[in-house]
Structures are given as C-alpha cells and as structure tokens.
Amino acid sequence: MAIFEGSFTSASTLKVGIVIARFNDLITNKILSGCLDCLKRHGLDTSELSNQVDIVWVPGSFELPIAAKTLMKKKSYDVVIALGAVIRGETSHYDVVISEASKGISQVSNENNVPIIFGVLTTDTMQQALERAGIKNNLGWNYALQAIEMGSLIKNLN
C-alpha cells in the first residue's frame, strides 16, 4: 500500500502564486502578511526580487478566479493561494460573491490541475474578520501551510 502526503520540509522548491482582493484591505493585508511570514519561515524567498512567489492584486473576491486562471497561463505554479475578505452586509451581495468566488476558484483549480487554496474569509462582522486576520489568529499562516502541503503533495504525485 502506498501512502502519499504533502511535506513541509520541501517547501523551498515550490513556486507559489498569490491572488489577493484589495476590497477590505485592512483585513487582506494582514492575511497576506501572515501568509508571507509562513512561506518565508518554511524556506521560500518572499523578497521583492523573488522568482518563487508572485502576488497579483484584484479589486475584490469576485475577481479572484479569473486572475488565478490568467496567472497560471502566464507561468507554471505548484500552488496558488486566493486571499480575500467578504463581510456580510444588509443585502444578498455577500452570498453572490462568496458563491461565485468559491465555484470559480474550484473550477480553475480543477481545469488546471493546480491546487488553489481558498483563503477567502467569510464573516458576519468586521470584528470576526479582524480576529481571523491577526487579533486572535492569522489565518494567512494556515492558508500558506495548506499551500505548502498541497503543492508538495501534487508535485510528488506527478
């Protein structure tokens, strides 16, 4: 019986793309910082001159799938991380954005056989978003760990 798992020790060989929504940037900037910190601590070069990590900013979470798709056509990535923050308001806009962003990200991932980590916070309040972006825990770190694990797993399976 063969057992395959992702590795956290081979992260330094990964090529990572990050697509990030500018909307709610108070939150998304914090998530990005946590994400980059984790990648750096696991051996990736996150400097501005890095050819290991690319970052693409988009207006909002709805635009994440098309940016991820376009990014993957431009270069070869082992994994992409989609970051955003959607906070429930008084209208149904929240439901539409989350539904379409999650479907689109999943579709792009499956079509390109590249894992895309769904790092879009979905919260009812700004306070909940702040807690998940660093006050209590920075989920950006968790999203980066998922990316390292999935990127190395798919690399090993191929």
Curated annotation (Swiss-Prot):
- Would I find Cell membrane among this entry's keywords? no
One record GO biological process: riboflavin biosynthetic process
Question: Which cysteine pairs make disulfide bonds?
Answer: none
Reactions accelerated catalytically = (2S)-2-hydroxy-3-oxobutyl phosphate + 5-amino-6-(D-ribitylamino)uracil = 6,7-dimethyl-8-(1-D-ribityl)lumazine + phosphate + 2 H2O + H(+)
Membrane-spanning parts: none
Where are the active-site residues found?
93 (proton donor)
Chain sites annotated for binding 5-amino-6-(D-ribitylamino)uracil: 23, 61-63, 85-87, 118
Its annotated function is as follows: Catalyzes the formation of 6,7-dimethyl-8-ribityllumazine by condensation of 5-amino-6-(D-ribitylamino)uracil with 3,4-dihydroxy-2-butanone 4-phosphate. This is the penultimate step in the biosynthesis of riboflavin.
Which NCBIfam families does the entry mention? lumazine-synth
Q: What is this protein called?
A: 6,7-dimethyl-8-ribityllumazine synthase
This chain's source organism reads Prochlorococcus marinus (strain MIT 9312)
Protein encoded by which gene: ribH
